């Protein structure tokens, strides 16, 4: 059935405008993104079908271009559109993070790092550079590796920190396996980085490991 034949209050776009985005199901939200259906399926039916094939919105968002474009109703234009939406969302979170003290909003910091790193297919090492008020100067992926490791060079972290005139750092990396527990290598490199930065009076405030739905804080565990 065409969405135009549905009562106005049941159409996803109109429902969002009158009741807000929270009132919509995943399929209805995805239908607004899709805008149109395909032969034999309206936008909501196509969205429901795609969610069943991918398993979740998260899996759809994390799909690479090749996998994404294999599905009917999706293609390079939709993939580019989705990546733009994801990037805008991440930049919004980063802007919000920069507006405050990361130590007074630890949950927001966790949420930002989770959104940024959780679904990466390769291990990446990310650094938040902070000023003397613990406000974010910048955040950067400094190293990217394979599915289970990333080579990290403390000298490069020190160099970049001095370039930003940072006073403190928050380190983070993901475990694509989904398990957020640190390895012995994680513990060693964190101590090496912390010691190297201490020589130039820069503190490591925390190191987060991002897994599948969980984040482990070195500071909270007493490892820093």
Swiss-Prot record:
Residues 102-224 form the MPN domain. It comes from Photobacterium profundum (strain SS9). Zn(2+) binds at residues 173, 175, 186. This is UPF0758 protein PBPRA0202. GO terms for molecular function: metal ion binding; metallopeptidase activity. A motif (JAMM motif) lies at residues 173-186. Belongs to the UPF0758 family. GO terms for biological process: proteolysis. Keywords: Hydrolase, Metal-binding, Metalloprotease, Protease, Zinc. It holds the Pfam family UPF0758_N. InterPro entries: MPN, RadC_JAB, RuvA_2-like, UPF0758, UPF0758_CS, UPF0758_N. Coiled coil: none annotated. PROSITE patterns: MPN (PS50249), UPF0758 (PS01302). It comes from the Bacteria. Transmembrane segments: none annotated.
């Amino acid at each position: 059935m065409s969405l135009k034949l549905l009562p106005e209050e049941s159409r996803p776009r109109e429902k969002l405008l009158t009741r807000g985005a929270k009132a919509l199901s995943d399929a209805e939200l995805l239908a607004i993104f899709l805008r149109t259906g395909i032969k034999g399926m309206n936008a909501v039916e196509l969205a429901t079908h795609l969610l069943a094939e991918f398993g979740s919105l998260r899996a759809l968002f994390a799909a690479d271009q090749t996998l994404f474009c294999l599905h009917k109703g999706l293609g390079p234009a939709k993939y580019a559109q989705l990546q733009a939406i994801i990037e805008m969302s991440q930049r919004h979170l980063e802007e919000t993070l920069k507006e405050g003290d990361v130590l007074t909003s630890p949950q927001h910091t966790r949420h930002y790092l989770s959104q940024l790193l959780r679904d990466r297919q390769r291990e990446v090492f990310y650094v938040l550079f902070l000023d003397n008020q613990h406000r974010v100067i910048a955040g950067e992926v400094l190293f990217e590796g394979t599915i289970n490791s990333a080579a990290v060079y403390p000298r490069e972290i020190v160099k970049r920190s001095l370039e930003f005139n940072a006073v403190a750092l928050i380190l983070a990396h993901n475990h694509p396996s989904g398990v957020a527990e640190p390895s012995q290598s994680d513990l060693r490199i964190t101590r090496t980085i912390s010691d190297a930065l201490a020589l130039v009076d820069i503190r490591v405030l925390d190191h987060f490991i991002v897994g599948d739905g969980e984040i482990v804080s070195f500071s909270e565990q007493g490892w820093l």
